[in-house]
């Protein structure tokens, strides 16, 4: 399980240090792709494969399903950390997530998210203001929270 928040700089070559605890959970190789809300998602290979199976079952005749799967998989790349614990984030993914100099790496249960620092601060501020309201809606889903 991934949890926590870490801030790190992105070097001029587009490399980002991934905290050791996250690297251990992600494994030697993992998948990085375009996430939702303007961030990147990183999945351990077994989690990615399970997600891939679920997405394969979406009806390809539905335009919205095709569009989501196309966008999600076209941005995906397999990553491996170097000896210093850094990954190279491809330019297209850096542009998508507006990653320039500072990044925030967060653990979100089964995945890791990579955010541009300013985007994360903005998102976190908005989410904090509606945290209780969201919690009330989630309780209605009977998840036992």
Swiss-Prot record:
Pfam families (alphabetical): MraZ
One annotated GO molecular function: transcription cis-regulatory region binding
Keyword Cytoplasm attributed: yes
Chief site of localization: cytoplasm
Signal peptide: none
InterPro entries: MraZ, MraZ_C, MraZ_dom, MraZ_N, MraZ_sf, SpoVT-AbrB_dom, SpoVT-AbrB_sf
Domain SpoVT-AbrB: 5-47, 76-119
Annotated compartments: Cytoplasm, Nucleoid
Domain of life according to the entry: Bacteria
Annotated CDD domains: MraZ_C (cd16321), MraZ_N (cd16320)
GO biological process: negative regulation of DNA-templated transcription initiation
Keyword tags: Cytoplasm, DNA-binding, Repeat, Transcription, Transcription regulation
GO cellular component: cytoplasm; nucleoid
Subunit structure: Forms oligomers.
Entry similarity comment: Belongs to the MraZ family.
Protein's UniProt name: Transcriptional regulator MraZ
């Amino acid at each position: 399980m991934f949890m926590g928040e870490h801030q790190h700089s992105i070097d001029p070559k587009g490399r980002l240090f991934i905290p050791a605890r996250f690297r251990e959970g992600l494994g030697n190789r993992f998948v990085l792709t375009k996430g939702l809300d303007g961030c990147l998602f990183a999945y351990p290979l077994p989690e990615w494969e399970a997600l891939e199976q679920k997405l394969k079952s979406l009806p390809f005749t539905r335009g919205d399903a095709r569009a989501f799967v196309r966008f999600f998989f076209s941005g995906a790349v397999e990553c491996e950390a170097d000896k210093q614990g850094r990954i190279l984030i491809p330019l297209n993914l850096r542009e998508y997530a507006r990653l320039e100099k500072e990044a925030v790496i967060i653990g979100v249960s089964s995945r890791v998210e990579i955010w541009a620092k300013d985007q994360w601060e903005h998102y976190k501020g908005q989410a904090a203001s509606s945290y209780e309201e969201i919690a009330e809606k989630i309780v209605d889903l009977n998840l036992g929270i």
